Regions:
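A nucleotide-sugar donor-handling region in carbohydrate enzymes
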Residues: 149-207, 232-237
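Conserved N-terminal ligand/cofactor-binding loop architecture of enzyme catalytic domains
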Residues: 23-99
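Conserved donor-nucleotide binding/catalytic region of nucleotide-linked donor-dependent transferases
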Residues: 315, 321-339
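Active-site and donor-binding regions of nucleotide-sugar-utilizing enzymes
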Residues: 73-164
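C-terminal alpha-helical cap of glycosyltransferases
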Residues: 337-356
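Donor-nucleotide binding loops and adjacent catalytic segments primarily
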Residues: 189, 194-264
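A donor-sugar binding/catalytic signature common to diverse glycosyltransferases
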Residues: 257-298
Length: 356
C-alpha cells in the first residue's frame, strides 16, 4: 500500500460509526497507509453538529414515532421525489475541502450516511478530485447513503450491495461487518452444554442507553430463568433502574465488550448496529426485540432476512426465541455459523483496491 493517505469520515452519533472508522484506520495503518479521522459533524456550521446529535438522541428516546416519520420522509428506501439531506450536506462543503487540502488524501472513506452525501455531491460537481469509497455500516441501505457521485460502496451483505448498485449505478462489494480482532478471538468453540446457573443474556441499548421497555424485558427474562446483563451505555439513570431488577446485572459504559461477549450466551438487540455485529464475530446468537424506529427497525429486519439474527414480534415470540437460541443444538449452531460466515472479506482491502 505504500504511502497511501486515507481520510475517514465518521460521526459522533453514538459510538458505532466512530468504532468502524477507528478499526478501518487500524487496518489501513497496518497495511502501510497514513490515516486521519474526521467527525463529519464538525464540518457543519458551528453548533449544527451538536444540535443534530441532540435532536436525534432526543427524538429516538422520547418521541420514537416522530423519528420514524422523519426517517420515512427523508431516508427510507423507495421511489418518488422526497426531501433529502442535500441542503445539510451543502453546508459542509467548504470545511471538507479545507480538510482535504490540509491532509492531501488519496482516498476518502465515509462511514456515516451524511458524509457519503457530502462526498458524493462534491465528486459529482467535479470539485473533489479524490475518490470516495463508502463503507455502509447499516444492514438496510437507506437513501441517505446513496449518491451516484461516490466511486464505490462496500456493504455488509450481498443484499445491501445489490441495493447500492441498483440505486447509484456504482460498483458495490461485500465485506461483511468491521469489528476489532478481539471479538473474533473470543469466539472459540462454545461448550455443548451450558455452564451451571442462569444463562447470561446481554441486552443492548447502545452508547446512549436508548430502548423501550428495557427494564421490563429484563424482568421477563429473569422470570424465565435467564440472567439479564443490561448494557446501559452512558445512561446512569437507566443503570440504576436496571440494577433493581432481581437477578439482573446492570452495567454502564464499558471498554471490554469483547470480554462480555465471550461470557454471554445470547444478545437481545434493538438496533442491528455495532453491538450486534460484534456478537456475530464472537459467536453469540442475536435476537432482535423492540428495535429502535426507522433505520433500527429496517436494519433489524434486513439482518434477520439475511439469516444473521432472529426477529421477535411479541413477548411470546421473544421467550420462544430465547429458549431456542440458548439450547445447544442445530438452531443455535446454525445461527452462530451464519454469523461467523458473514465476515467474507477485509473491508480495508476492498475500499483501497484500484478500480477494475
Amino acid at each position: 500500500m505504500g504511502s497511501l493517505r486515507v481520510l475517514l469520515l465518521g460521526a459522533s452519533m453514538g459510538a458505532g460509526h466512530d468504532a468502524v472508522s477507528g478499526e478501518l484506520a487500524r487496518r489501513l495503518r497496518a497495511r502501510g497507509a497514513a490515516t486521519e479521522l474526521c467527525d463529519v459533524l464538525t464540518l457543519l456550521p458551528p453548533g449544527t453538529g451538536p444540535a443534530l446529535r441532540a435532536f436525534y438522541r432526543g427524538t429516538v428516546r422520547h418521541a420514537p414515532a416522530l423519528y420514524a416519520a422523519i426517517y420515512a420522509l427523508f431516508l427510507s428506501p423507495g421511489d418518488g421525489h422526497r426531501p433529502g439531506s442535500a441542503p445539510l450536506a451543502a453546508t459542509a462543503r467548504a470545511r471538507l475541502l479545507r480538510r482535504v487540502r490540509a491532509f492531501r488524501p488519496d482516498l476518502l472513506v465515509p462511514t456515516f450516511h451524511l458524509a457519503a452525501q457530502i462526498t458524493g455531491r462534491l465528486r459529482a460537481e467535479g470539485v473533489l478530485s479524490v475518490p470516495s469509497s463508502v463503507f455502509v455500516t447499516d444492514f438496510a441501505v437507506h437513501r441517505g447513503w446513496l449518491h451516484p457521485g461516490n466511486d464505490l460502496y462496500v456493504c455488509l451483505t450481498a443484499q445491501g450491495a445489490e441495493a447500492a448498485r441498483a440505486a447509484t449505478g456504482r460498483p458495490a462489494a461485500v465485506s461483511g461487518p468491521v469489528v476489532a480482532p478481539e471479538f473474533h478471538r473470543v469466539a472459540g468453540p462454545h461448550p455443548h452444554a451450558p455452564e451451571p446457573g442462569p444463562p447470561p443474556v446481554l441486552l443492548s441499548t447502545g452508547a446512549w442507553g436508548v430502548g423501550t421497555r428495557t427494564v421490563r424485558t429484563a424482568r421477563l427474562l429473569a422470570a424465565h430463568g435467564c440472567r439479564p446483563v443490561l448494557l446501559c451505555g452512558r445512561d446512569e439513570r437507566l443503570r440504576r433502574r436496571a440494577a433493581r431488577v432481581p437477578g439482573a446485572v446492570a452495567l454502564g459504559w464499558t471498554d471490554d465488550m469483547a470480554g462480555l461477549m465471550g461470557a454471554a450466551r445470547l444478545l437481545v438487540d434493538n438496533a442491528a448496529g455495532q453491538t450486534a455485529v460484534q456478537a456475530l464475530a464472537a459467536g453469540v446468537p442475536v435476537l432482535a426485540w423492540r428495535p429502535l424506529p426507522g433505520h433500527g427497525r429496517d436494519g433489524a429486519r434486513s439482518m434477520a432476512a439475511a439469516g444473521l439474527s432472529t426477529y421477535a414480534h411479541d413477548p411470546d415470540d421473544l421467550l420462544a426465541g430465547v429458549r431456542r437460541l440458548l439450547r445447544p443444538g442445530p438452531v443455535r449452531t446454525c445461527q452462530v455459523e451464519r454469523g461467523r460466515a458473514a465476515f467474507v472479506a477485509d473491508a480495508a482491502e476492498l475500499l483501497t483496491r484500484p478500480p477494475g
